[in-house]
């Protein structure tokens, strides 16, 4: 059960589903289902400059790193993500700059690495991170994804607001800083600009 992505729906549905199919034969349509879709244009930019260029050309594109939330859009709501870019090769988004009393954390940093970085400077935030999700989730989930998808039940934004965090945002070659509390405009609405 440690592989369950979220804690918000509990484990009961997983246990019920497992019991419901226990001993049943695997249906042919599951065995014969192709793994890859018919078209697979899957850009994976290796720098934030390459990502900014791709995103400017695909302003409605979906950015994926850990996919712990976005994956549910597909599996639970059958959402067509349209153009997708995979961010896990973008190493400059996976950096943590420890400046003593300040941390600058890239959007692609996993929650496991955030936890390791914040334990001393912000022990309460570290304790909170340790309590949500499983090791598998924290190894995949990124701090940028948790903020950008704007989930009203997101774990990090309230803590980051309380700590006075600032977001460093980029659109093409234009960069701006905004307090994280100003990024969240209304329920489900963020100060995000296409591209």
Model-found features: residue ranges?
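C-terminal structural segment of proteins
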Residues: 1-195
């Amino acid at each position: 059960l440690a592989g369950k992505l979220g804690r918000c729906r509990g484990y009961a549905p997983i246990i019920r589903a497992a019991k419901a199919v226990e001993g049943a034969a695997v249906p042919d349509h599951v065995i014969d289902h192709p793994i890859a879709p018919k078209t697979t244009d899957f850009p994976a930019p290796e720098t934030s400059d390459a990502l900014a260029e791709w995103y400017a050309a695909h302003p409605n594109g979906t950015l994926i790193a850990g996919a712990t939330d976005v994956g549910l859009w597909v599996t639970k709501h059958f959402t067509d993500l349209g153009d997708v870019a995979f961010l896990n090769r973008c190493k400059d988004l996976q950096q943590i700059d420890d400046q003593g009393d300040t941390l600058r954390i890239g959007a692609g940093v996993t929650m496991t690495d955030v936890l390791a970085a914040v334990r001393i400077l912000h022990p309460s935030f570290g304790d909170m991170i340790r309590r949500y999700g499983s090791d598998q989730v924290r190894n995949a989930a990124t701090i940028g994804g948790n903020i950008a998808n704007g989930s009203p039940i997101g774990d990090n934004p309230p803590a980051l607001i309380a700590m006075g965090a600032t977001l460093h945002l980029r659109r093409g070659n234009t960069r701006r800083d905004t307090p994280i509390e100003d990024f969240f405009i209304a329920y489900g609405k963020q100060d995000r600009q296409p591209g």
